[in-house]
Structure formats: structure tokens, C-alpha cells
């Protein structure tokens, strides 16, 4: 019998938060137990939940900042200690919680001398700063500084091109990931035909969501993803044998392409940090300008072996991490890019 009263015999899978702690304003930890699973099921759920928690749970972030009278990102302003670039980096780190999914504006309007923090930002009612003490800039002289901020909600990462911005507006490399890390482990119990598995999931968030909220959102996302299969009818399945010349096959192929595109978009927004590779392998990939999972999947095993200081052991570590965290594998050969003739 589990702590919350769930027995193996009734086979009702239940979950419970068995540990929760606030390590800091921007680091919350939760540990969850889910059971009982039949053999093999716990690992399936663990992989799916880890991927959903890291890739499907969205958040709010500052995506751009507009400065008055600033020519370029590396400009310095008299009376301000930091460069514009340094300020943008600090704005990237600001943790926000938004109750609205739409784009919103915020204003940072202060007069020096002053040490400016996140608590000085004037936000719309639906947005709040998680940690008022997060540092932004120091104004060393009695001057006024006005910065217009754009806030958006999304999932994953977003790296904008500077070429798309004009008139003193600069992009902020936004991070829309309330979930910082996820671990899971599977533990068998019982014996023989009564052998079952317990799944433990550990979740770390940035404080904008509690781990329990993150688990709930990830679960809903996974359910929504699978719900179309609950309503499939026989007539929805194309009869390829009797209708080879119809448009059914083309429509079905188009749907498959949409699924591939969705996964491709996910990998484009997921950085290789999530693989938790050893430092040697990670640094080699970064030196080769491999920053996202999408970048990594454009290399075959043989391609990776050609990288400087990247041996078979490192390739095996990458392959194992890709499978364990994203249930995907390196291609057998370098993917062909259309137009490369």
C-alpha cells in the first residue's frame, strides 16, 4: 500500500507531491511519486513528462527593449555604468509570471543616481516580477533613463536577429522556460505477476510556476496532444489499397509533414544544455557552433567524429543523452539539404 492509500491490486495510478521546498525566490523544487505502473510503462511516462515539462510548459519573458537616442547594442551612455549590451543581458535574466498570453508593454523609468533592479519596472496588472532584487543597471549621475520593454509568452528559447529591429529597439534573447531541470527514476516493487513500477519525478522551476503547476501544465499538454486518437473513426483512416490515385495519400503525407515540422520547431528551440553532457563533449559542440538539438541532428555519427577532439566516447554520450531525454537518435548520414546539389 502506498502512502496515499493506493494499492497495487486496484491498478489505479495516482500521483503525489512527496517533497517541496523553496531554495530561493528563483529556484523551487518538487519531488513527485506516480504509481503503480506495469513493467515498462513508468519509463515511457517519465520520458514523455520530462520532454513536456522542458518543452511544452511556457512562460513570460522580456523580448525587446527600446532606448532613447541609442545607436547600437554596444553603445555607452554617459551616466550609466553598463553598456546597452550588458543591460540587455540583465533583462534576459528577469523572471516574470504573466496571467495573460498576449504581448504586453512595461516601462522602466528611473532617475539617478540609483542602483536599478527588477522591482523598479512598471508592469501591467497581469504581470509580476518574481524577484524584485534582480539587478539591471547602475545610474551614476542625476539623469533620467527610460526603457520601453516588450513582454511575450511562449515556450522554449528565442534568439532574434538584430536586423529586424530599428529606432533604438534591441532584441533580448528570451527564455520562456519556467522549468529549469527535470530528473526521473523508475523503481520496481513486488514480484512475479505482481511486479509493478514506481516513477519518481524531480522538477526545478524558476519560481514563476510551482513544480506542481508545471506538472499539471505538462500533463494537460500531453493529454491534448494525444486526444485526437480518442475520437478516430474508421472512415478517418485512408484506404490506400482501394484508393491509390486519390488525394488521400497526399493529405495523409501532409499531416505527417506537419508532425515532423512541429518536432523540428521544438528541437530548434531546445538548446544542447538540456542534454546535460560532460564538459568536454559540450564544449566541443559549442566550438563547432552546435547550439540547439536541431543543429546537433544535422550531424551524423561520422560527422561528429570529424570534429576536433570529439571521439567515439563523446559520440556515444551524445547518442545516449538524445535517446534518454528526447527519444530520438543521430541520423545515419548527414541530412540532405534541398538545394545542395
UniProtKB/Swiss-Prot annotation:
Catalytic activity, reaction form: RNA(n) + a ribonucleoside 5'-triphosphate = RNA(n+1) + diphosphate
Locations listed in the record: Plastid, Chloroplast
The UniProt record lists the keyword Chloroplast: yes
SUPFAM superfamilies registered for this protein in UniProt: C-terminal domain of RNA polymerase alpha subunit, Insert subdomain of RNA polymerase alpha subunit, RBP11-like subunits of RNA polymerase
GO CC field: chloroplast; DNA-directed RNA polymerase complex; mitochondrion
Record text on subunit structure and interactions: In plastids the minimal PEP RNA polymerase catalytic core is composed of four subunits: alpha, beta, beta', and beta''. When a (nuclear-encoded) sigma factor is associated with the core the holoenzyme is formed, which can initiate transcription.
Purpose of the protein: DNA-dependent RNA polymerase catalyzes the transcription of DNA into RNA using the four ribonucleoside triphosphates as substrates.
Protein name (Swiss-Prot/TrEMBL): DNA-directed RNA polymerase subunit alpha
